[in-house]
UniProtKB/Swiss-Prot annotation:
Pfam families from the UniProt entry: MFS_1
MF terms (GO), sorted A to Z: xenobiotic transmembrane transporter activity
GO annotations of cellular component type: plasma membrane
Membrane protein topology class: Multi-pass membrane protein
Main location: membrane
Keyword check for Transmembrane: yes
Record has Membrane as a keyword: yes
Domain of life of the source: Bacteria
Protein's name in the database: Uncharacterized transporter RT0591
Cellular compartment(s): Cell inner membrane
Length: 409
C-alpha cells in the first residue's frame, strides 16, 4: 500500500473525537429532555439508539464515497450536514422531530469515525499503526468524558437547546479549519472508482473474523455509551446530584482511559508484548470491572449506603472496565481490516456499520431495561463482556485454522 501523505496524529484525533464527544455532551441532558417533553426516560434514551443507527447508515455510505471521490471532500460534506442538523435540533418542538434531527446529525458526523480510520490506515501501517491507535486511545475516551463535564454545566446553567448551539459552533469551526488544512490521503482514488462495492461486501459477509471483531468493538462501545445513557438518570434523577457534579464524576473515567492507553503503548512499544497478549490483558480488566459492577449493583439494591459510597461503587468498576477498553479497542481496529488495504474506505464503512449496529442494539437494550436502579445495566455489561471474550477465543481458533491452511499451500 502506497502512502502519499501522513496525516498528523492531532488531526486524526480531531476527527475521531467529534462523534463520541457529541454523544456524551448530549447524554448529560437526557433527564432534562425527559422533563421538557414530559415523556418516559426510556423514550429519551432511544434518541441515542437512533443516533447510532444514523451513524451506521452514514459510515456505510460516506466511507464508500470517500474511496471514489477522496477523503477530504466527504469530510467537509459530513461536517456541513452535522451543522445543519444541529441547528434543526435547537428548534425541535417534540421528541419525534429531535429523533429525526439526531439521526441526520449522526449521519453527518460519521465521517469523523469512518474516514478518520481510513486516513489513519492510508498514512500508517503495521506496528506503527498499532502504536498510533494506542496513543490515540486514551484521548478518545478522555475527551468524550470531558464532554459530560461540559454538558453538565450547559444543562445546569441554561437548557438542552444550548447543547445544540454548542455543536453548531464547534462544527462551524472544524469545517473552516478542515477546509484550510485537511490533506487528501487516498492514493487509490482511481482504483476505487473501478472497484465494485458489492464484491467487497460479499467478501466481508463471509469474513467471520471481521464480524467477530465488529461484535467486540460494538459490545465494548455499547457498554461505554450505555453507561453515559443510564448514569444521568441514576445520579441526577435518583440521587439528586447536580448536572455539573455529574459531569465532574464522568470526567474521572477519563483517567482510566489515559492509564489504559499509556499502558497499551508501553507494552507494545517498550516491552514488545504481542498485540494478542495486550488484548487478553484488556479482557481481564473488563471482566474484573464488570463482575465488580454486578456485585456492587446488587449490594446497592438491598443495603442503604451514603451517596458518596454509592457513587464510588458505580464508578470504580466502570473505571476498571475502561482500562481494558483502552487496551483492547485500538488493537482490534488495527487487525480488523488488515486484509482490505486497497478498499479501506469501502471495507471500513461496512465494518463500521456492523459495529455501530451492535452499539445501537446495546443502547436499545439499555432503554428497554431502564429502571430505578443500575443493576439491570450492570448485568448487561457483564453479558457483553463475556460474549466478547468468547468471540475473541473463536477469533484465535479461526486464525490458527487460517495459518494451517496457508502452510499446507
Amino acid at each position: 500500500m502506497k502512502i502519499i501523505v501522513k496525516i498528523p496524529v492531532w488531526m486524526l484525533l480531531s476527527l475521531f473525537i467529534l462523534s463520541p464527544t457529541t454523544e456524551t455532551i448530549y447524554t448529560s441532558g437526557l433527564p432534562s429532555l425527559t422533563k421538557y417533553f414530559s415523556i418516559d426516560g426510556c423514550i429519551t434514551q432511544i434518541t441515542s439508539t437512533l443516533y447510532f443507527l444514523g451513524f451506521a447508515v452514514g459510515i456505510l455510505s460516506l466511507g464508500r464515497l470517500s474511496d471514489i471521490y477522496g477523503r477530504r471532500p466527504i469530510v467537509l460534506l459530513g461536517l456541513f450536514i452535522y451543522i445543519v442538523s444541529s441547528i434543526i435540533s435547537i428548534f425541535s418542538v417534540n421528541i419525534e422531530m429531535l429523533m429525526i434531527a439526531r439521526f441526520i446529525q449522526a449521519f453527518g458526523v460519521s465521517v469523523g469515525s469512518v474516514i478518520g480510520q481510513s486516513m489513519a490506515r492510508d498514512s500508517y501501517q503495521g506496528a506503527e499503526l498499532s502504536y498510533v491507535y494506542a496513543i490515540l486511545s486514551p484521548w478518545l475516551l478522555f475527551i468524550p468524558s470531558l464532554g459530560s463535564y461540559i454538558g453538565g454545566y450547559i444543562i445546569e446553567y441554561s437548557s438542552w437547546h444550548y447543547v445544540f448551539v454548542f455543536f453548531s459552533l464547534i462544527g462551524t469551526i472544524l469545517l473552516a479549519l478542515y477546509y484550510k488544512i485537511l490533506p487528501e490521503t487516498n492514493y487509490y482514488i482511481d482504483f476505487s472508482q473501478s472497484s465494485k462495492y458489492f464484491e467487497v461486501f460479499n467478501i466481508i459477509i463471509k469474513d467471520k473474523i471481521l464480524w467477530l471483531y465488529a461484535f467486540i468493538i460494538g459490545a465494548f462501545n455499547g457498554i461505554y455509551y450505555g453507561f453515559f445513557i443510564e448514569a444521568p438518570f441514576i445520579l441526577i434523577d435518583k440521587m439528586k446530584v447536580l448536572p455539573s457534579f455529574y459531569g465532574k464524576l464522568a470526567f474521572l473515567l477519563s483517567f482510566s482511559a489515559i492509564f489504559g492507553g499509556f499502558l497499551g503503548g508501553y507494552l507494545i512499544k517498550k516491552r514488545q508484548v504481542h498485540d494478542k497478549k495486550v488484548m487478553s490483558i484488556g479482557f481481564i480488566f473488563s471482566l474484573c470491572g464488570c463482575i465488580l459492577f454486578v456485585v456492587n449493583a446488587f449490594i446497592l439494591e438491598f443495603i442503604l449506603v451514603s451517596n458518596g459510597l454509592a457513587i464510588s461503587m458505580i464508578f470504580v468498576p466502570m473505571m476498571i472496565h475502561i482500562i481494558g477498553h483502552s487496551l483492547l479497542i485500538p488493537i482490534t481496529l488495527r487487525y480488523a481490516l488488515e486484509d482490505y488495504a486497497k478498499v479501506t474506505g469501502t471495507a471500513g464503512s461496512i465494518f463500521g456499520a456492523i459495529y455501530y449496529i451492535v452499539i445501537a442494539a446495546v443502547t436499545y437494550c439499555v432503554s428497554k431495561i431502564h429502571g430505578e436502579t443500575i443493576s439491570n445495566f450492570s448485568l448487561l455489561c457483564l453479558v457483553s463482556s463475556i460474549s466478547s471474550v468468547i468471540s475473541f477465543y473463536y477469533i484465535c481458533i479461526l486464525y490458527k485454522k487460517k495459518s494451517i491452511v496457508a502452510n499446507e499451500k
